[in-house]
Amino acid sequence: MEEAILAGIGGDTNVEEVVVDTALTMDTAALGQTPIADANTQDSLATITTYVYAHELDFMILEKDVFDYYCNLNAFADLRELLGAGACEALGARIYEKNGVACGITLTDTAFVKQYGITLLDPVIGIVSGSERKEQAVGMLRWIFEENVGVAAAFSAEEYKAMISQEETGRKDDGKNV
């Protein structure tokens, strides 16, 4: 899966690496407890927190209940800002909103879930708000939905680069030097 993802987003195998960590487990009932008593859930939360602070986590695919936990912590970028109206419109009911933010995309019954045998209940993918590689994370979304040409085409790399340029410089770019 890692090699397919890296190839799918156009990554350079000489300098980039994709790591898929399927060993993390969380008890959704434990997420509602204070303090969290389940040791596996504590370990998984600590691992994810470490990845986030090290800027090593760009997106997460989680069960909806766990995804909600992270949404409540503002862990995910607003996809309306990253993808634009066209992509969000093309995704339609797959856009997952929480607290008025388009924070994820449901993956239930996608070719991606079927091909890789993802067994999560109601899987949702979100781009981590602190990711330093949001363009690659958007590329991941494009790759996941490439079987749906209308959705994949809505992810414009040029529009995304212009948006990032504006975000980093605080000004609108004319698009010529993006």
Which ranges hold each PLM region?
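Extracellular/periplasmic bilobal clamshell ligand-binding domains
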Residues: 165-178
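Structured segments of extracytoplasmic/periplasmic soluble domains
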Residues: 4-12, 51-55, 69-73, 82, ...
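Extracytoplasmic/periplasmic/luminal assembly and interaction segments
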Residues: 2-65
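Periplasmic-binding protein-like
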Residues: 88-126, 144-163
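Extracytoplasmic "Venus flytrap"/periplasmic binding protein-like
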Residues: 42-99
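Short amphipathic alpha-helical coupling segments at ligand-binding clamshell hinges
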Residues: 132-143
